[in-house]
């Protein structure tokens, strides 16, 4: 009985140490996250929303190729799984995607370094009879974009003036 109590006590002690707030137990080491440097700032400051100008399959192939990328791709009509629209994450948020190119916004350049990019499948604009017209965005696509954008904006504390379209940061492209 005494040995059992000793084992239970040891297990409780180890459990208490392992669950200490700010300490993360990793394979081969422990990570202490309780001390944050003040000389740091969040990398992400801008959310850039683009349209693809291509269909979904071409957009997916292009955005997973070697020359251009985006963090997210939302199809015109996202398929529903469990009642929720599916969105494709192509680049982890902590990694830089190549979606902004040569860009400028509110005094900052190289926006790929400080932004998250979302691509919306959409044919974009067409010229007809000398008139430029834009394809509308589907309601289902916008309904998928809203919770994703809200989540990103909240997590990175992105200011409203820093939620932009591609045309805002690179008007000539």
Where are these regions (language model features)?
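Sec-dependent signal peptide recognition
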Residues: 2-8
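C-terminal motif of bacterial Sec signal peptides marking the signal peptidase cleavage site
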Residues: 15-16
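Active-site-adjacent loop/helix surface patches within enzyme catalytic domains
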Residues: 21-40, 46-159
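Acidic/histidine-rich, metal-coordinating catalytic segments
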Residues: 156-173
